[in-house]
């Protein structure tokens, strides 16, 4: 569950958002839209517990069960996808690591490149690998900031299918492509 009451975030004199109320039940899907610089990323960072609100009440799941992907996927470019996911699976204490890693690499079309250095990947392939990393530990709350960023048509379709498969989990998604996830949204926040 995600609940916010009178949530506010400021940077000095700049008000990013103020008086925000949210009620997102387990399994809900919050779609966050708005132009660049409107506060989408700041809100997502607060909900992912990477930044503190300036004011307000906030009820969130424990940090260990939150998965977050920002504009830049957190992956090690000098490693292979297999090495990246195996490392994160150990850190997250994922049971049956090999099977989980293999399934995610296959799901996101990276199995054939599992032994290639991430530094040779396109931005879209790195984004898909970042999504694999986020999904490794099967988080209860997924906070995705522009997950379609840099994905080509095939990559976007793979993400669409993954989001459909993950219905029942709680999502907060900011995107400039709301049409891709509109069908999943149960709640909306639109920044001006």
Language-model segments: which ranges?
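Conserved structural motif at the start of ABC-family nucleotide-binding domains
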Residues: 2, 17-19
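The feature captures the beta-strand-to-loop junction immediately N-terminal to the Walker
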Residues: 33-35
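Helix-to-loop junction immediately C-terminal to a conserved catalytic motif
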Residues: 48
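Conserved ABC ATPase "signature" region
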Residues: 86, 96-113
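Hydrophobic anchor residue at the start of the ABC signature
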Residues: 131
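Catalytic Walker B motif of ABC-type/P-loop ATPase nucleotide-binding domains
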Residues: 142-146
